[in-house]
Curated annotation (Swiss-Prot):
Disordered, as annotated region: 436-466
Sorted UniProt keywords: Acyltransferase, Iron, Iron-sulfur, Metal-binding, Nickel, Transferase
GN (gene name): cdhC
Phylogenetic placement of the source organism: Archaea, Methanobacteriati, Methanobacteriota, Archaeoglobi, Archaeoglobales
Protein name per UniProt: Acetyl-CoA decarbonylase/synthase complex subunit beta
EC number: 2.3.1.169
Compositional bias ranges of the Acidic residues kind: 437-452
Amino acid sequence: MVERKRIEIPEGVKVKESVGEEAEFPFDISPMYEGERIRKGDMYVELGGPTQPGFELVMALPMDQVEDMKVTLIGPDLDEMEEGQAYPYAMIYYIAGEMVETDLEPVIERRNHDFQNYIEGYMHLNQRYDIWIRIGKNAIKKGLKSLIQIAKATMMLYKNELPFIEKIEAVYITDKDLVEKLLNELAMPIFEERDARVEALSDEDVDEFYSCTLCQSFAPTNVCIVSPDRPSLCGAITWFDGRAAAKVDPEGPNRAVPKGELLDPIGGEYSGVNEFAKQESGGEYERIKLHSFFEYPHTSCGCFEVIGFYMPEVDGIGWVHRGYAEPAPNGLTFSTMAGQTGGGKQVVGFLGIGIAYFRSKKFIQADGGWYRTVWMPKELKERVAKYIPDDIRDKIATEEDAKTLDELREFLKKVDHPVVKGVVRPVDGKKITNGWVEEEEEEAEEVAEEAAAEAAPAAQPAQAAQPMAMQPMPMQMPGFQLPALQMPAASAAPAGVKLVIKDAKITIEKVIIKKAEKEKKGGK
């Protein structure tokens, strides 16, 4: 177990400290501000996000090691930051109390997203190592001068909303070197440890799953179902975390969900989950399959760590994580696909997941799992490499192998990926796709048979090729019907030969229709 202890502050960095509760704040604090978006033009500064390192972390410590309502700020404060720029950002909370235990750390940590969005002019997105904060210009105009004020407001909300927290202390860091050091040496090992706990447990081993509705302020119809084999989309809540949260706050955002009857063991559909999803989504959804990509997929909020996207050109699924900025082979970036995927929608063809879901033995098992996966960024693939079966690992392309659909198709042919000849899903040995080769062979055989049948009377003297007539279009014009159109004789195919045009797109910019003039007497 990773040791929980207070961080050491290096020499030579700027430090501010403040102890005790704040008398008043220069901003409103209310749930009405949840879901507030701060656009780039309205932003004073950005903290963390796509261009700067950042993380949030909660650690449970003994009572005597936590100084209640103390804030330590390491690095430049708001009044030293340049408007319009982005800065590193880490938020560490030490918590203590009789009921506080290590199992509650991720649950309390996830509520940081909840509480900080109560603050007017402060936007908090994502979680763990993906946090993305924006502070609005209006908040600065109203008197927000220091991140210490944000920390004090957040700690006050923690103690008011979660009274089992008897002591809380915050350390906020904007010094880039220290943020990166603590992210790699402290936060990531703790996150990894939390995720690994649930690997030995399976959906069949428990009687209930847990919900998470924290993101409904941004995605009102999203209902996250957390099972042993499927962690939350944000990656911050596992089944153990949901259980711990429901124990201390049974009416909170993490509630027990009875599994009910197992309706589809491969797709992961349960009657209890369906009933809960229907209720919590306001009737927007009636069915959810936890381990299916195409049929009644899980809804996606906007905090997902990874987006799965279907590419019909190769009949395969790609995955892209939040940290990959380049376009995927389908030509879309993560941020563009996020707009299609998020918002609490059930979208066939796009799916948001947490990185820990790649560990699952049931990873999109209804649709072939890893054997349907054809592309991932190298960074993501390396991160989850040990969970990819040996016989498919080298057949999954990265940006070094393919950046376009044409390049991806060639790569998949070269390595003989299962999608080329047809995917057999491991869970039940069923072949679920035909593959390209089989489809191409069937089409070739069909064309050959038809050509042979039409060539049979070719022993007779060949007739001159006749113009190919197209039937009248089912379109009525005032007073007359569109006449039949004729192709020029030069375009006609020779007798006994069938012309097959595949994958063609025909664009007609203009159709001009004229009445035929009657022949003048005398043949003129």
